[in-house]
Amino acid sequence: MGQKVNPIGFRLGVIKTWDSKWYAEKDYAKLLHEDLKLRNFLKKRLYHSGVSKIEIERAAGKAKINIFTARPGLIIGKKGSEVETLKKELAKLTEKEVYLNIQEVRKPELDAQLVAENVAMQLERRIAFRRAMKKSVTSTLKFGAKGIRITCSGRLGGAEMSRTEWYREGRVPLHTLRADIDYGFAEAKTTYGIIGVKVLLFKGEVLSAKK
């Protein structure tokens, strides 16, 4: 079970929490679609800003969006000019008042989503997939991760047949619910087709093991 399921979804309510924090009754579906629209827009708009996670909180007529990024300067812009433009664009997608909160990811090497996007970008630049995987694994472990596993899937190296290759170092316990495992997924659009990159990053155990 732990092998197949999304490690974050598997740990929700145990050691992980939801990215959308709001409650609704009748218009639940509408708000859910709105969330999806906002996330897709931000991912596309801030593609080069190293966005790791987007949290959405809602309260009476207001929507607070927390953006976790490795490059906050790119999003904020000179004297906050970029943020104001972004706010106006988001306000068009939702009927609510939008509040933006930009938070910096201090160690992008310890963020699974950013590691996955980094590997995907290297693959798009025609760097050999094994080299890209190894480089990311080494730098992540250097920054204090307990273990990491990177999987690349697709027409690797322009091969005729698609295949899956993975590289792991350290411990990545997928069944242990108290294990703090971060998960990231990115796609590399190469001339041979799309290559999927999955990253599982083990940061250590959260709850103390029962004696």
From Swiss-Prot:
The protein's matches in PROSITE patterns, at most eight in alphabetical order, are given as: KH_TYPE_2 (PS50823), RIBOSOMAL_S3 (PS00548)
Q: How does it assemble?
A: Part of the 30S ribosomal subunit. Forms a tight complex with proteins S10 and S14.
Query: InterPro entries this protein is in?
Result: KH_dom, KH_dom-like_a/b, KH_dom_type_2, KH_sf_prok-type, Ribosomal_S3_C_sf, Ribosomal_uS3_bac-typ, Ribosomal_uS3_C, Ribosomal_uS3_CS
**Role played:** Binds the lower part of the 30S subunit head. Binds mRNA in the 70S ribosome, positioning it for translation.
| Keyword Plastid recorded | no
- Give the keywords, sorted: Ribonucleoprotein, Ribosomal protein, RNA-binding, rRNA-binding
Family named by the database record? Belongs to the universal ribosomal protein uS3 family.
- Which top-rank group of organisms is this from? Bacteria
Q: Where is the KH type-2 domain?
A: 38-106
Gene coding for it: rpsC
Q: Which GO terms describe its cellular component?
A: cytosolic small ribosomal subunit
The record ties this protein, via SUPFAM superfamilies, to:
Prokaryotic type KH domain (KH-domain type II), Ribosomal protein S3 C-terminal domain
The processes (GO biological process) annotated in the record are: translation
> GO molecular function: any one?
structural constituent of ribosome
A Pfam family it matches:
KH_2
Task: Tell me the protein's name.
Answer: Small ribosomal subunit protein uS3
